[in-house]
A protein has these predicted regions:
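Exposed alpha-helical structural elements
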Residues: 44, 59, 122-125, 154
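A generic structural signal for well-ordered alpha-helical segments enriched in polar/charged residues
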Residues: 62, 66, 161-164
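Short, Lys/Arg-enriched charge-dense amphipathic segments
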Residues: 36, 92-107, 147, 159-168
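Short, conserved beta-strand/beta-arch hydrophobic-aromatic motifs that form part
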Residues: 75-140
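Well-ordered alpha/beta subsegment
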Residues: 128-169
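Charge-rich, low-complexity N-terminal segments
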Residues: 2-65, 71, 76-80
Length: 169
C-alpha cells in the first residue's frame, strides 16, 4: 500500500479555524469608490461597468433626471458602501444608484402607503426577489434592486409609485 508523503497528508486536513472551501473564503464585494476625499463624477459610475450594464445604469439615471423636481448629487454613504448617486425629490430622498462590486444597484425606500400602492405581482422575478430580501420595518421598507436584466424596469416601476405617493403628501 502506497501512502502520500506526510506533507501532503497534513495539507489535506484543515487546521482549527481554517476555511476549507473557496466559497467559505469568499470576499465581500469590492467597494467601487471607497475614499471619501475622492468624489467620483456621475459619468464615472457607468464607465466602470461593462457596456451592457453601463447602458442600463445610464437608462435608469436618465429616467430619474427626466422626472420633474428630481435632482442628482454624488453622496458618500460610508467606507463600506462608498459613493453613490443620490436622487432627491424636492427635499425628500427618492433613491440611490450605486455599484455593488461590479453590478449596478438601485436602492429605494418605500413608505407603508407606497408599498401598499405597488402591484408586486406585476414585477419580474428580480423585483419580487428584491421584495423578499427587503429590510427595514413595515413603515419603511428598503429595497435593493439589481439593475441587470429586468431589474431596471422593476426599479423604474417602484420609483414611479414612490413619486406618485410623494406627490400626494
Amino acid at each position: 500500500m502506497r501512502s502520500s508523503p506526510p506533507e501532503k497528508r497534513r495539507a489535506a486536513v484543515p487546521k482549527a479555524g481554517e476555511r476549507t472551501s473557496p466559497s467559505a473564503a469568499a470576499k465581500p464585494p469590492r467597494v467601487a469608490f471607497p475614499k471619501k476625499n475622492q468624489p467620483p463624477s456621475a459619468a464615472s459610475f457607468a464607465a466602470r461597468l461593462p457596456l451592457a450594464l453601463g447602458k442600463r445604469f445610464e437608462m435608469a439615471r436618465s429616467f430619474l433626471l427626466r422626472q420633474p423636481d428630481v435632482k442628482e448629487d454624488v453622496y458618500y454613504y460610508g467606507p463600506k458602501t462608498g459613493w453613490a448617486l443620490r436622487y432627491v425629490h424636492g427635499e425628500q430622498p427618492l433613491c440611490a444608484l450605486l455599484l455593488h462590486g461590479d453590478l449596478p444597484v438601485g436602492i429605494v425606500s418605500l413608505s407603508a402607503s407606497a408599498a401598499a400602492a405597488l402591484d408586486w405581482k406585476a414585477l419580474s422575478p428580480i423585483g419580487q426577489a428584491a421584495r423578499k430580501h427587503a429590510h427595514g420595518s413595515p413603515s419603511l421598507l428598503w429595497l435593493d434592486v439589481p439593475l441587470a436584466s429586468t431589474g431596471a424596469a422593476d426599479f423604474k416601476a417602484i420609483v414611479r409609485v414612490k413619486l406618485a405617493t410623494l406627490d400626494r403628501t
